Structures are given as structure tokens and as C-alpha cells.
Amino acid sequence: MKSRLLVALLAGAAVALADPAAAQQPIVIKFSHVVALDTPKGKAAEYFKKLAEERTKGRVKVEVYPNSTLYKDGEEMEALQLGSVQMLAPSVAKFGPLGVREFEVFDLPYIFDNFDELHKVTDGAVGKLLFQKLESKKITGLAYWDNGFKDFSANKSIKVPADYKGMKMRIQSSKVLGDEIKALGGIPQVMAFSEVYQALQTGVVDGTENPPSNFYTQKMNEVQKYLALTDHGVIEYAVIVNKEFWDKLPADIRTTLEGAMKDATKYANDIAKKENDDALEAVRKAGKTQIITLTADEKAQMKKALIPVHKENESRIGKDVISEVYKATGFKQ
């Protein structure tokens, strides 16, 4: 019996010596997010997993937890800082409550007209500066992923600011977004993303804001009668990682993961617009939600009500940051 055990141990040692990788446990990256698999972010997370595992030849294992199955959006940031999860892709609105208020520049209504303008910021000096500010929070920023431009939804027709008066509108935790709703005469309601469907269904809130992909994949078209194509803001994600975990990775692994993330980012941003266009068409075909296209006059009224939110938040976000975004995009008040 002892001799058989000795032979087995020696054989195992021989395999380990012949192939050191076989003796090593893979590095596990838990990647948590709050949206469905069939959204731009959901698909990009799965693509990153595929690339990371293939390119590291199994030395890294990426476990993706979609749809708030591991943490809700109000919990995940603390979990990342504590090291309970290694990677997230939260909306950039989440960094304001963390104390990095400069990120709330992305929440300013009508600051971007299109993805090209957005990318001039995320790919430029402002995007890099914002990621540097996360380092003191035990967070390393890896990439910006697009979702899409937001539209307002409700259970009554919404075309101009007066239509929002007294309406309870769900928002992410962001002072800027709260000011946005107040500027329209509505009542902002901060709520976890995973709770929104039920809140809309039961009338706890009257409406919300989302890109079409989130609106459709979370089945909000089942509980919202109207969707106004306001394109009043963006939801942009930042892929972030626990700084201590990232810094301790072997240099070759880190380099490989950076390459995988770069390719996953291109994939995410390439599909974002199409995914939202497809989702909007699916909402249209489902026939449960009336889609409202604003006239030029209605759009002008919305902008007139919302653009002052920029000035209101200069001291909070930083006038210099807002000015740099204006300069990069050519924004004119």
C-alpha cells in the first residue's frame, strides 16, 4: 500500500516538473455586472472572458456574474475595494458617490451629441485623468465601454418639460442626475437597477431613463407605456479592477490581459449602437410601448430646461473638467 502511494506521489511530482503549469491553480477573476447577457456590456464581458482564457492558455479563469447575480449595483463597488470581486464595469455615475465627482461630467445632459464626441473624451486626456483619480480608491481603470444614449420612459406621454412635473423618476445615485430630473419638475428616486422593473410595475416610480438595450432586455417595455427618444445623456461604463490584485499579477499575465481588454473594448464599442438600434426595433415590434419622436421644438424645450444643470454642477465636478470636455467635443451652450 505504501509503495503504491509512493509511486503515485512520484508520478504526480514528475508530471508537475514536466509541466509546471499543471501544478498551478489558475488565477481567478470574478467579473460582476448588473445587466443582462444580451446587452453590449454583457456580450463584451463574455468576449473578454474568452480572450483572456485563450491567450493565457488557462492560467487565468474569468468568472462572469451578470444581472446582479453576485452583487447589486449599490454593493459591488465596496466588494471590489475589499477584494471580494476583482473586476466590475459600473456606470461612471457610480464614481461620484465614491468621492471622484469629476466622473459626473458624463451625466451632464446633452453634453454629447454622438459617440464620436464621447470617444474624444474617453480616449483622450480627460479619460486618462479620470482613471488616475481612481488609484487612491484602490481601483485601477482599464477601459471605457459604451452602452448608449438614454431615453426617458413613463406611463404617460412625455414630450416637453411640463409633462414631467410631479413624476417620480428612477435614477442612478448621482447628484447630477437628480438635478436633471428636478430641472424637468420631476422627483428623482435613487434605486438599484435590479429593483426597477418591479418598482415600475407596482407604481413605486412612474418612469426612468435608459438606453434602449437596457430598456428592452430588462423587459421595461412590459410596464412602461411610453418611450420618448430624448437622447438626453449617455450611459458609459468603466471597466475597473482591484488595484492590489492587478499590481500583484505576473507582468506577462497583466500584459496579456491588457491586450484582451483592448480587443474586448473595440468589440463592445463596435456593437453598442447596433444593439441599441435592434433593441428599439424590438420594442416597436412588441407593440406594448408607444415610441415618441420629439419634434425640433420639443427637443429645444428639453435642452433649454436641462443645459443649466451644467452650470449648477460646475463647483461639484470642476469647471476645468467641464471646460476640457467642451473643448474636446466643440460643445456650445
Q: What are these regions, as identified by a protein language model?
A:
Residues 15-23:
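Sec/Tat signal peptide C-region and signal peptidase I cleavage site
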Residues 24-117, 125-333:
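N-terminal secretory/targeting leader peptides
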Residues 1-7:
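Twin-arginine (Tat) signal peptide motif
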Residues 7-16:
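Bacterial N-terminal signal peptides
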